């Protein structure tokens, strides 16, 4: 569960290392985001000469959460970190590589590019 002020790792090579959630998109008073939800983030830590710099405000999709994802068979898939992938205005990833596993819940029409770039889909 990701909410406002949550710090997330960035799971791509966009140049950002850490981002902070500043808004959960989708509804006027929506409080939590889970895997596959789009959030508005601010870049808090970035590498030199990356595509993004500290202070940039961007959209991101949540790809891993410590809280985990509940599957229809009752199993829960949990991760060691909260991670997101940065998106451009067209909801496409701005990076060319994705680091770490992502879940099958991202396999909708919107995020197939992220699933295809990921090294492992759980």
Swiss-Prot record:
One Gene Ontology cellular component term attached to this UniProt record is:
cytosolic large ribosomal subunit
Q: Does the keyword Cell membrane apply?
A: no
Task: Note the InterPro entries from the entry.
Answer: Ribosomal_uL14, Ribosomal_uL14_bac-type, Ribosomal_uL14_CS, Ribosomal_uL14_sf
Does this entry carry the keyword Phosphoprotein?
no
Q: What's in the keyword line of the UniProt record?
A: Ribonucleoprotein, Ribosomal protein, RNA-binding, rRNA-binding
Q: Name one GO biological process term.
A: translation
Question: In the record, what terms sit under GO molecular function?
Answer: large ribosomal subunit rRNA binding; structural constituent of ribosome
- Superkingdom of origin: Bacteria
Q: Which Pfam families match?
A: Ribosomal_L14
Q: Which PANTHER family match?
A: 50S/60S RIBOSOMAL PROTEIN L14/L23, LARGE RIBOSOMAL SUBUNIT PROTEIN UL14M
Summarize the subunit comment.
Part of the 50S ribosomal subunit. Forms a cluster with proteins L3 and L19. In the 70S ribosome, L14 and L19 interact and together make contacts with the 16S rRNA in bridges B5 and B8.
What is the protein's known function? Binds to 23S rRNA. Forms part of two intersubunit bridges in the 70S ribosome.
> HAMAP family under this entry?
Ribosomal_uL14
Q: Which family does it belong to?
A: Belongs to the universal ribosomal protein uL14 family.
Q: What is this protein called?
A: Large ribosomal subunit protein uL14
Native species of this protein? Psychrobacter sp. (strain PRwf-1)
């Amino acid at each position: 569960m990701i909410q406002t002020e949550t710090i997330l790792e960035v799971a791509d090579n966009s140049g950002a290392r850490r981002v902070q959630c500043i808004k959960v998109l989708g509804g006027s008073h929506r409080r939590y985001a889970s895997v596959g939800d789009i959030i508005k983030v601010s870049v808090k830590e970035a590498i030199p000469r990356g595509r993004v710099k500290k202070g940039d405000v961007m959209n991101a999709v949540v790809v891993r959460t410590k809280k985990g994802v509940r599957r229809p068979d009752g199993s829960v898939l949990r991760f060691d970190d909260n991670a997101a992938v940065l998106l451009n205005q067209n909801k496409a990833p701005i990076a060319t590589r994705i680091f770490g596993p992502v879940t099958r819940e991202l396999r909708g029409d919107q995020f197939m590019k992220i699933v295809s770039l990921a090294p492992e889909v759980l």
